[in-house]
Amino acid sequence: MKKVVILGGGVAGMSAAHELIVRGYEVSVYEFKSIPGGKARSMPFVGSGTDGRKDLPGEHGFRLFPRFYRHVIDTLKRIPYENGTVYDNLTEVTRLDIATYTAPLLPLLAKIEFSLDNFMVVIRDLFDNGLGLSMDDLEQYGRKLWQVMTSCDERIREEYNLIDWWNFIEADQQSPAFQKIFAGFTKTLVACQSKIANTQTVGPVAVQMTLDITTPGTSFVRLLNGPTNDKWVNPWLIFLRDQGVDYHLEAKVESIDCVDGVIRSAKVTENGKTFEVEADYYIAAFPVEVMGKFITDAMVQADPTLVGVQKLVDSVAWMNGIQYYLKEELPITHGHVIYLDAPWSLTSVSQKQFWPDVDLSQYGDGTVKGVLSVDISDWDTPGVLFGKSATLCTAEEIKAEVWAQMKLSLNVDGAVILEDDVLHSWFLDTDIQFENPDQACTNMEPLLINRVGTWDDRPEAYTAIPNLFLAADYVRTNTNLATMEGANEAARRAVNAILKQDGSAEEPCEIWEMYTFEFMHIDLLKPYHHHDKRRFEKGLPWDGELF
């Protein structure tokens, strides 16, 4: 039995372990943190539980599962949970609301049923939208989405990788409302300004999410029906260990030793002892900013493309969460709220309404009735209370600033949705560290951003080092986005590369095409793609024609 050591136990590492253990490999995983799951994990608000109750649930950031996810959804269906699977813990949202400083909440449907009433809501949302968009704005955005939809893969990968989203949609020539909404959403989606994010990533995702919101069927996004580790990660870890995976928590990888073009061992510290781990194959499942530090001269000599990973170390931004525990349940909307005017690019979800089987009276001091989980995607723009960016604020100031920005966005036109006296307590992601009061805070887990031109720096899941494989969201994938889906797909690609290297007869992991924009499983755009591919090969620009 061949042995595989996986360095890093987040979604990528656990996905790789899952696919390997069911194919008969011996698998060991070494995870630095005390809680499994990486960025996806939920975590306790330590010390909040009293009189035998559990600590309140906190998280790095709320989890969501867009309709277009394929790889991670398939994995959820293969993790046992009680009498079913973890997949059964997904629950649909029905709304996506936009909050501004100047108008009441604008509801967008997240799930559209076949009815005239709902169809009219979509029309009204798009054309009588209260966001200041003109018909010219809407037509321009539609034209640009159509361009992405009808462009060939080669053009998207080679040409649009070199164009930022702002320039691609010609935002300079459009209204301030257009710029704020259609250019600004990249900050919320990928924690990256539209003048930096490449169109190869943003374009297909923007099209896919627009189609998912505006076409009937499953909700465009689903959530778990409880804290992530309770409903997914912990059952997954139990399953992996039951299958034979040797999963180590609080095990710090110190170095990876490459000699004569192959990996000889990895050095790990656990329980105060440092030791070498050896295997037939190694999967590095670290995020890019960590992996960059482990790449040695010997590794680069064996595979010069690994220099690209080192270049990507700075292609990260911050997207971290804060949870507000409330004295009463405050649904706000049955889904997510995007705070369009909030300088810190906030999104939130009121979680208790999606957690029917979670009794919050068994948490904290027993009086919490609701959890408002907020993601902060802009840490560099000054806020409304202190005139400072989030990076320069204390934890207490971040709490106050985010709360104030939400109140400004929700309490509009006489409506009072969010009041100070409903706040019980709060929890800021522990990845945000305040080591020196006189300096900016630091972030232990930033998020990869796909800057213009960075596709060329991203590696495949296999390397020129025959026993080293990569599984993380910076790896080249069809998903092409720093997400759980991208991490899971990268893990599958790493496992498939091991199977190939091993000459294994085991069935490879399934890899899905993404962003195919099919309707009823029919690729209606295929003729356009063929036409554009012929033009691209001749060096001609996209023209959107069929022939």
Predicted regions and their residues:
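N-terminal Rossmann-like FAD-binding beta1-loop-alpha1 element of flavoenzymes
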Residues: K2-V29
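Glycine-rich FAD pyrophosphate-binding loop
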Residues: I21-G47
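Glycine-rich active-site loop/strand segments that organize a redox cofactor
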Residues: G37-H71, L145-D153, T201-G203, V207-I213
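Active-site-proximal substrate-binding core of FAD-dependent oxidoreductases
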Residues: A497-F547
